Amino acid sequence: MLKILVNRKTFLTILILTGTILLLSDRALPAKERRAPLPSVPGYVAVPVHYSHWNKMMMEAVVNVHRARFVVDTGAGYSILDAGRAHSLGVSPVGADSPYGEFANLNGVRYRVGYLNSLRAGAMDFGSGPMALFQPASEDAALNARINGENEDGIIGADILTRYKAVINCYTKTVFFKTGSSEQLHVARFAASQNFKRIPLREEVSRAFTVPASINGHSCRLLVDTGAFITTFDLSRAKEFGVSFTNTRMSGSFADGITRRVAVGNVANLKIGDYQVPPQRLAASVLPDFAVDQGQAKIGGILGMELLAASHGIIDFDSMSVFFK
């Protein structure tokens, strides 16, 4: 049965950085390439994903027998469907007498709720159920930033990913969804045999997911966000940690609707858990307050898609771990 959390508020932040991928072009991901056959794992269904030109992790799906494209987004607390495309996908808003409620309250904004008779991705059958219908022209900049510019139909968010104990292999471009109650993928055992570093993944009060990190020996946490195509530090915090950045002409349009300048700098001493990140150029900007305000967590920035893939990242929502090598 497909369900969605319709009352939980989440931070949802991603920046759209025009030109940043060109400046950091060595970190861009190939959109399409030949892939190995999908593995067969008892108790799990493997679904292929691919990267778009903007490093978004895309999953091909079928909604009510109609083909659709979804962004796989660990930074989105809930899954949504573009209201403008709902009709062509055979999805209509539910009525006032619906047991799921006529409206969903997401990020303080009310959205109509639609009912999906079926949602499938590859061999994975998510079943039927309600999903919030997002209006891109609405005032919710957070969602608008995430479902914009890639011709996608919606977002597969943390509600579905955590419900099915998803294991996201960012390097092999495969997502495993758990369908059996007793089987376990034992990612940690495999990762240890392949010299991966295991990093604990923590859910914050806002339903953001973070990992421990350090910059020049200063402890912080990074938001794990497959919806962010570029790793971006909070500029003030990075400077506080002794990292120098050079201003550029580029700007970023953030989830709070404010456009900010983007800086780039050489980061030589970044550790994520026990994993030492190779020295490289990374971006920084003044991140929105709701991105860095995660209760007691001291957020240093957003861990984006390019670094997750380059580090052979595996995100395991079963053991609540991230693995790098």
PLM features per residue range, with description:
Residues 13-22:
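Bacterial N-terminal signal peptides
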